[in-house]
């Protein structure tokens, strides 16, 4: 089995380090310096780099790392990625230190966003966060909703390795959506204790996300009603002018309403 550990970067980024013995891959190295320090401290040899999407805080360190090690760079083929040697589009299987890893297309945050799945673990970049999901900078609500559905279909004990420590703020929003969700209330207390102790809230557990993350619960009655209320209170005038249906209860419509609410929360 691969060992997975985090390398903190910037204010709240996690660069994921995958190791087997002294061999290593890194995921989304936005900054080379902390990666170089960890590799050198552990006597590790970098063999590959996995990139989920093109944003600078996820690929900014690639050139420097590739100059030090001639590592393969696996990345979305339809995005501009420094040094990409293995362009991917989703659906491929790649070998990561002897572990078969499935490449998943998860558009939404960006159009070419990828996630990397091996049994028990998903490296998802900025698609899913603790109690939240990524902003839709390029994709549509329908695309992101479908991407989240593909993640939700994985086994419940899957550990989710996302790229940012956003859980506490996301939980505050989730409580605004579902104030009576007891699992959510318990998670708020648990995460607060972790963060107070200086510990990360990740990796996430998929089953817990499905019980507490509003973006994975757009089919639940409480989330549907909260989404409709937000649409009615914030979008009524515009919707009426445009002839839009603010009573649309489809999962995509509710996701769009909840995501819009989160953007201004």
From Swiss-Prot:
Associated pathway: Secondary metabolite metabolism; methylglyoxal degradation; (R)-lactate from methylglyoxal: step 2/2
Organism: Dechloromonas aromatica (strain RCB)
GO biological process: methylglyoxal catabolic process to D-lactate via S-lactoyl-glutathione
Role according to the record: Thiolesterase that catalyzes the hydrolysis of S-D-lactoyl-glutathione to form glutathione and D-lactic acid.
GO molecular function, one term: hydroxyacylglutathione hydrolase activity
Enzyme Commission identifier(s): 3.1.2.6
Keywords: Hydrolase, Metal-binding, Zinc
Binding annotation for Zn(2+) 2: 57-58, 126, 164
Cofactor: Zn(2+)
Superkingdom per UniProt: Bacteria
Pfam family, one: HAGH_C
Residue sites binding Zn(2+) 1 per the record: 53, 55, 109, 126
Gene3D superfamilies from the UniProt entry: Ribonuclease Z/Hydroxyacylglutathione hydrolase-like
InterPro entries linked: Clx_II_MBL, Glyoxalase_II_hydrolase, HAGH_C, Hydroxyacylglutathione_Hdrlase, Metallo-B-lactamas, RibonucZ/Hydroxyglut_hydro
Keyword field contains Ribosomal protein: no
Entry keyword Hydrolase: yes
Subunit structure: Monomer.
Name listed for the protein in its UniProt record: Hydroxyacylglutathione hydrolase
Family named by the database record: Belongs to the metallo-beta-lactamase superfamily. Glyoxalase II family.
Reaction catalysed by this enzyme: an S-(2-hydroxyacyl)glutathione + H2O = a 2-hydroxy carboxylate + glutathione + H(+)
Cofactor note: Binds 2 Zn(2+) ions per subunit.
